[in-house]
């Protein structure tokens, strides 16, 4: 009997976190052949990926594709796939990923996109911004417009040698959007968000509540967005950390909550703890939020855990960051949909912290259905749902019982 072969295309270097996040261990433990191709350099040539050279997953083939020659060789592998898990894009076509997407199209094999991680659409408030400011922002953005990207997005797929995705994995109600590779041809597979999936694994209800506040760190001064967003000149990291630490000190003194740092997975705090010695925890944001009384973040999508576990949320920012034209509409959208006003770090000494210990239950409920999960609780994991969907379409055998074993992961 031929063993089903799943070929994954990942737009960033795989990490231990991705083993569960992308279902690698799940499908391996179902007895399938799983091949993972890291195409980060192909899809993001301006960003140097951070890779652990010792990283491996028992029973899973891992390979880096960084040159056009290696990309050409990938075409032959794609033709052997039962299913291509094309997770190098959520559906957008760009000049950088066009060669890869052509290989997928020419393989003739069915391919799947992952769109389970929807978030609020940018909220523009043009009517409240003075005309001179709007004009200045538009001129600034035009300096960084890429005509080739605009053309790539608008060309018919066939003209570009591409074809629509066969399937798309969805999360909440608003995760489906017809654009780019997602057309009327694309069949939905109803799942839920990765964060909801993580909550299912550890327990979906709050437990062992502690007097803690959790800062969902984004490694903000060194975030990779600044490598891409050339319109943003950066900001003073020392000033940022001084301000957040003043906020944390007030929270600890006035609210009686110990602030714990849920570190960004790519953060490097080995040489220095910029949070004045506060506890830094890697890889456990869900567990920390589940047990806390307040979650704090700038705009980390890990704020989803606050919604899942029904925890009050504090959104923070500062003038240089909040005013970035490309980012500001997203910040406004989070604030609007969650009913949480941003706390500006410039005002950290005077803001009423107690106001952030409340949350709007109705808005949380809507956010949960729109962006996280829109199905009745049945205990099935995201990848069990995906497997069921693919088997119903005749692409994979029906699922076996049992849970994936993620112990066979090696990294330095």
Functional labels for PLM-detected ranges:
Residues 301-375:
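Catalytic binding pocket for nucleotide-activated donors in carbohydrate/polymer assembly enzymes
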Residues 66-74, 193-196, 260-309, 313:
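Donor nucleotide-activated moiety binding/catalytic core segment of transferases
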Residues 35-37, 112-113, 167-171, 258-264, ...:
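Short, hydrophobic beta-strand segments that form beta-sheet elements in well-ordered domains
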Residues 197-270:
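Conserved catalytic-core segment of nucleotide-activated headgroup transferases in glycan assembly
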Residues 46-52, 124, 222-239, 324-327:
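Short, flexible/disordered intra-domain loops and linkers
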Residues 370-412:
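C-terminal alpha-helical cap of glycosyltransferases
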Residues 6-31, 36-200, 302-303:
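Active-site and donor-binding regions of nucleotide-sugar-utilizing enzymes
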Residues 20-21, 64-72, 93-100, 233-250, ...:
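Well-ordered, non-membrane alpha-helical segments in soluble/globular domains
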